[in-house]
Amino acid sequence: MHDYIKERTIKIGKYIVETKKTVRVIAKEFGVSKSTVHKDLTERLPEINPDLANEVKEILDYHKSIRHLRGGEATKLKYKKDEILEGEPVQQS
């Protein structure tokens, strides 16, 4: 494994522990894909720093456990935003 990959993996691991941000947000901030962030955190980090990997795993598991709630909230906000922009209520079923 190249040194820059190890460094990035550790940086991302520490960053997610400090901020509790999602993989999607971190990927955007680090300029890499979600797949890369996920692979760094779930496959590479345990080899490099098992203790940090355990902390990260807890955060990822938490995010996974609430993703169905986040998705619903995002949809709700989207329709609310559309309603405000159009000036009339969006029909909901």
Swiss-Prot record:
Keywords: DNA-binding, Repressor, Sporulation, Transcription, Transcription regulation
Superkingdom: Bacteria
Function: This protein regulates the transcription of sigK, which encodes mother cell chamber RNA polymerase sigma-factor (sigma K).
DNA-binding region: 21-40
Membrane-crossing residue ranges in chain numbering: none
Entry annotated with the keyword Glycoprotein: no
NCBIfam families in the cross-refs: spore_III_D
GO biological process, one term: sporulation resulting in formation of a cellular spore
UniProt-recorded name of the protein: Stage III sporulation protein D
GO molecular function: DNA binding; DNA-binding transcription factor activity
HTH deoR-type domain mapped to chain residues: 4-75
